[in-house]
Regions:
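N-terminal small/glycine-rich loop or linker at the start of catalytic domains
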Residues: 2-33, 149-165
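Glycine-rich anion/phosphate-binding loops
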Residues: 30-45, 99-106
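Alpha-helix-loop-beta-strand connector modules within alpha/beta enzyme cores
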Residues: 8-9, 14-15, 67-97, 136-158
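Alpha-helix N-cap and loop-to-helix initiation/capping positions
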Residues: 29-40, 71-79, 133-137, 170-172
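Conserved, mostly hydrophobic/aromatic
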Residues: 14, 48, 56, 119
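Conserved anion-binding
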Residues: 21, 105, 109-173
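A short, N-terminal amphipathic alpha-helix
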Residues: 39-54, 86-89
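Glycine-rich, proline-tolerant flexible connector loops at the mouths of alpha/beta enzymes
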Residues: 52-79, 125-131
Length: 173
């Protein structure tokens, strides 16, 4: 699967950590409005591409404190789509989307709109406890959403035992 996206088996994926987006408690349009956020993302993308990474993952990393996937707002999706489209149009390497925290459906929608090649999902199966509370696996829901969008060309990069919390189950089946 990795060669399908990156043309190498073990890619180096650079991270584009977007500044706080509209809707985030830390968003300050006087300091970083959307034009500045997009400009910064594009500058970072070009630097990382020149450094030789094989792809770029765009994340709302500074939208802290994070909310669970089903609580992610439309404003986050809109802002991330604007940034992702600008980044994609400024580089010649593939991009992917990760929406904190476990926002697989939001990431899939953004990927469809922006032409991203993959999404990252923190918890595809099982459940874990993190600073956002109980986060449940979204594999079944995401598979159905992906089918509905006819997005089989968008790959899923999913964590197992994600670093962002402790698993809720006490015994693996």
């Amino acid at each position: 699967m990795m060669k399908k996206i990156f043309e190498v088996q073990k890619p180096i994926i650079g991270m584009i950590h977007l500044k706080p987006l509209p809707g985030s408690p830390n968003y300050d349009k006087n300091k970083f409005d959307m034009n500045a956020i997009v400009k910064y993302a594009v500058e970072e993308a070009k630097i990382l591409e020149q450094a030789g990474v094989n792809g770029l993952q765009i994340e709302n990393y500074w939208d802290i404190p994070f909310v669970k996937g089903e609580e992610i707002g439309y404003e986050t999706c809109a802002a991330m789509t604007a940034a992702a489209c600008a980044v994609k149009n400024s580089v010649n390497i593939p991009i992917g989307i990760n929406v904190h925290m476990n926002g697989g459906k939001a990431a899939m929608a953004i990927a469809c709109a922006s032409g991203a090649k993959w999404i990252r999902v923190f918890e595809f199966v099982s459940a874990y406890v993190s600073y956002t509370g109980l986060t449940e696996g979204i594999g079944g829901e995401l598979a159905r959403y992906r089918k509905m969008l006819d997005a089989k060309d968008i790959q899923l990069l999913c964590d197992v035992n994600v670093k962002h919390g402790s698993h809720f189950i006490v015994h693996d089946p």
